[in-house]
Design a protein with these regions (language model features):
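Internal alpha/beta scaffold segment
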Residues: 170-206, 210-214, 234-261
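Extended interfacial segments that mediate partner engagement and assembly in macromolecular machines
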Residues: 63-74, 80-202
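Short, solvent-exposed loop/turn elements at beta->coil junctions and helix N-caps
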Residues: 119-126, 206, 213-215, 453-456
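Terminal RNA-binding accessory module
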Residues: 1-78, 376, 383-384
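Rossmann-like S-adenosyl-L-methionine
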Residues: 2-13, 18-23, 237-473
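Short, aliphatic-rich beta-strand segments
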Residues: 218, 224-233, 294-298
Length: 473
């Protein structure tokens, strides 16, 4: 006999008191901490518990009794469905206040180290249309909104291009307007969608692995250049013809596109790192500019997605490094060498290390394009490349700049940094929690001298943080 499912409680007239991880807010009911999406501190709501553990629960708001005085009206029609921009219900001034608190709480609670006064967070000048890259997914499993489901109508058009629905990997929400990228992105996506509808193109099915149209990537830059990459599954010659007809339509409709590319992808996933990118029209790259430096960006290249704030972030890192032109700098997790090249004019020599070989090739190209001859780049796993032997061979760094992934630095990397004993360490992080853990491991030899949070992603809970450490006397 099947076990009867336990009925979860309805919590009435609960006041939301704070923000929490992953863009959620929280309330406390007796000793129970309740995490709730799409509410803000000050809201008074009825909460339907969806999942309950001993000391915490997850719930959704089913009724609002009072709206918080700081609540903002979300500006996007897709808010609350697509899974992005979860903090649109908070004014931007409140968002950055909570991001500042997130950095402070993590450094104190996890790091448990002596801290200077944390500098005020550096907010983003642009809070809409700030991204330079978006990817959209094609699917024949369009997500139906609650209103559409209630109408109990059989819809003829179930193809969609947009964003994956959280928790429903094969469903895609049809996006009409996204506020993250310049509006040309919306125009291109919608034009491709309409053309595909009109000409009966097949959209990909993630479960059956059938269908032609798979993915669309659009990149913009401050130089005005524009890249569009269409990813398709091609099993018949006729489908290749259909794809090229679509690309020809895009080229004619949007002559401002400077790089029109395509990828044939017959794999089970959408990653293109191991696939050949073909040029349909224009160049295979676009450029981004920063302080007179030009950075070449291909379809596979990594570049910070908020160009304006990336510049501010890099300036903070460079200022913290305190370069005089005499220093040997190690740039760890260098990516395409953006920071390495950005600080090279103020350093004697910069050595960049990165896991992805293609990114290192981009870094070398970017040095060459800008006439920079004092950089060296190495590809490989950081813990395997950055060793005591490597340091003995290349020299002890005066400054280390490190910008690791969200997981932070491997223990072996931290131990090698401690062996290298640079005078200063500049730690750039996209995850203050793992940064705090790493800082505690460096604390015996290094003191935190400055902390600068930077908001790269308005309307999300994500925050970057830059920390300067100096060797203890």
């Amino acid at each position: 006999m099947a076990r009867k499912k336990k009925e979860l409680p309805l919590l009435e007239k609960i006041t939301i008191t704070d923000v929490a991880a992953e863009g959620k807010a929280l309330a406390k009911v007796n000793d129970l901490v309740v995490f709730v999406p799409y509410v803000v501190p000050g809201d008074v709501v009825d909460l339907q518990v969806k999942r309950k553990k001993n000391h915490y629960a997850e719930a959704v708001a089913v009724k609002f009794h009072e709206y918080s005085p700081v609540r903002a009206v979300p500006f996007c029609q897709h808010y609350g469905i697509c899974g992005g921009c979860k903090w649109q219900c908070l004014p931007y001034t409140e968002q950055i206040k909570y991001k500042q608190k997130q950095v402070t709480d993590n450094l104190i609670r996890i790091g448990k180290i002596e801290l200077p006064e944390i500098l005020p967070i550096m907010g983003s000048e642009k809070t809409e249309f700030y991204r330079n890259k978006l990817e959209f997914t094609f699917s024949n499993k369009r997500w139906l909104t609650e209103e559409e489901v209630k109408e109990d109508v059989k819809y003829d058009q179930m193809n969609a291009v947009g964003f994956h629905i959280p928790g429903a990997f094969d469903k895609v929400l049809a996006i009409e307007k996204c506020w993250l990228q310049d509006d040309i992105s919306n125009q291109i996506r919608n034009a491709i969608r309409d053309y595909a509808y009109e000409h009966n193109y097949s959209f990909f099915n993630l479960r059956s692995q059938e269908g032609m149209l798979r993915n669309l990537m659009i990149r913009t830059s401050s130089t005005g250049e524009l890249m569009v990459l269409l990813q398709c599954k091609i099993v018949e010659e006729s489908e290749m013809d259909l794809m090229k007809q679509l690309l020809a339509f895009v080229a004619e409709r949007f002559p401002q596109i400077t790089s029109l590319l395509y990828v044939v992808n017959n794999k089970c996933n959408d990653t293109i790192n191991d696939l050949e990118v073909m040029v349909f029209k224009g160049n295979d790259h676009i450029f981004e500019e920063m302080e007179g430096l030009r950075f070449k960006i291909g379809a596979k290249s990594f570049y910070q997605t908020n160009s304006g704030q990336a510049y501010n972030l890099y300036k903070v890192a460079r200022n913290f490094a305190g370069l005089t032109g005499k220093e040997l700098v190690y740039d760890l997790y260098t990516g395409t060498g953006t920071i390495a090249n950005f600080v090279s004019r103020q350093a004697k020599k910069v050595i960049g290390i990165e896991y992805v070989p293609e990114a290192i090739e981009d870094a070398k190209v970017n040095s060459a394009i800008n006439g920079i001859d004092n950089t060296l780049f190495y590809a490989g796993d950081m813990k395997d490349i950055l060793t005591q032997e490597f340091i003995n061979q290349h020299g002890r760094p005066d400054v280390i700049i490190t910008d690791p992934p969200r997981a932070g630095m491997h223990d072996d990397v931290i131990n090698t940094i401690l062996f290298a004993e640079p005078q200063r360490i500049v730690y750039v992080s996209c995850n203050p929690a793992t940064q705090a853990r790493d800082l505690s491991l460096l604390d015996a030899k290094y003191k935190v001298m400055a902390v600068q949070p930077v908001d790269m992603f308005p309307h999300t809970h994500h925050v970057e943080n830059v920390v300067l450490l100096e060797k203890r006397g």
